[in-house]
């Protein structure tokens, strides 16, 4: 359910691309420093966006350094270090990845996910005193989501997606006590709903073939159509829902006093979401794509 929130590279200035990579690599290094080597494999672009957005709400000066890493052992990469927003994003990166593994185990008894979750569990408690209340919020929201998915009958896609949307709204608005917290919440809420729905559409064929829960199939496929037939009937509906969510994200973003990185953030919310949506709706395989 992660990795959909990325810049549109075609519309990105070179300096903005380098800044995005510096946050991404900084997040990777922070995960290693705060949680260990293993959790670094969970890094995703969505949490990079979170770090950039939250760091852009304050006029603090970033510290840039050049370091080697396991992926790029020869050439040093520019990273942002000692950054409060990145530390916050690192925690949620690890925590959400852990609960995603638990969901995989619950869904299909995945042995791989079961083993990985046991290894990852000890890491999410490394900063438990600092982030204890956030762990409870993640746990409660995702448990509510799983209950709603199991009892999907007579529920709308809005009702089911609410739990994940509320969680992402909580994550964005709970960083600090800004006077524009409400806009942060609704930006996060609509982004979470967008992620939940686009992920469901991306996985629709696989989930239908494996007879797994998929909110789009379970809510809308009343006539039990096969994938090809059903996709043709539902595509415009999903397009409409995703465009509305993306529009609400941008509207709330425009109400927030962004101090820096505005061009990069605007690129992600204006062009990146629409590009990703277009590719997923066309059936492009995004699994191995990277920036």
Regions found by a protein language model. Give the residues of each.
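Acidic catalytic motifs of isoprenoid enzymes
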Residues: 1-166, 170-186, 197-243, 251-264, ...
């Amino acid at each position: 359910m992660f990795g959909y929130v990325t810049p549109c590279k075609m519309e990105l200035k070179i300096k903005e691309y380098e800044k995005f990579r510096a946050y991404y690599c900084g997040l990777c290094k922070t995960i290693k420093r705060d949680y260990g080597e293993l959790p670094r494999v969970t890094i995703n672009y969505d949490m990079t966006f979170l770090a950039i957005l939250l760091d852009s709400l304050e006029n603090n000066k970033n510290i840039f350094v050049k370091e080697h890493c396991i992926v790029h052992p020869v050439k040093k990469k520019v990273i942002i270090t000692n950054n409060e927003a990145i530390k916050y994003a690192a925690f949620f990166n690890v925590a959400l990845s852990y609960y995603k593994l638990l969901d995989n185990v619950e869904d299909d008894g995945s042995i791989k996910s079961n083993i990985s979750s046991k290894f990852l569990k000890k890491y999410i408690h490394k900063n438990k005193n600092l982030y204890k209340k956030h762990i409870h919020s993640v746990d409660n929201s995702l448990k509510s989501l799983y209950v709603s998915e199991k009892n999907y009958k007579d529920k709308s896609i809005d009702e089911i997606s609410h739990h994940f949307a509320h969680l992402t709204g909580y994550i964005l608005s709970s960083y600090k006590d800004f006077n524009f917290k409400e806009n942060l919440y609704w930006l996060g809420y609509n982004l979470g709903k967008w992620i939940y729905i686009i992920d469901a559409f991306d996985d629709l064929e696989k989930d239908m073939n494996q007879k797994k829960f998929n909110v789009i199939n379970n809510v809308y496929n009343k006539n039990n159509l096969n994938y090809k037939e059903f996709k043709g009937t539902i595509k415009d509906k999903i397009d409409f829902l995703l465009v509305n969510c993306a529009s609400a994200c941008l509207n709330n973003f425009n109400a927030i006093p962004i101090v820096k990185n505005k061009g990069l953030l605007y690129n992600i919310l204006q062009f990146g979401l629409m590009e990703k949506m277009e590719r997923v709706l066309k059936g492009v395989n995004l699994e191995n794509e990277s920036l």
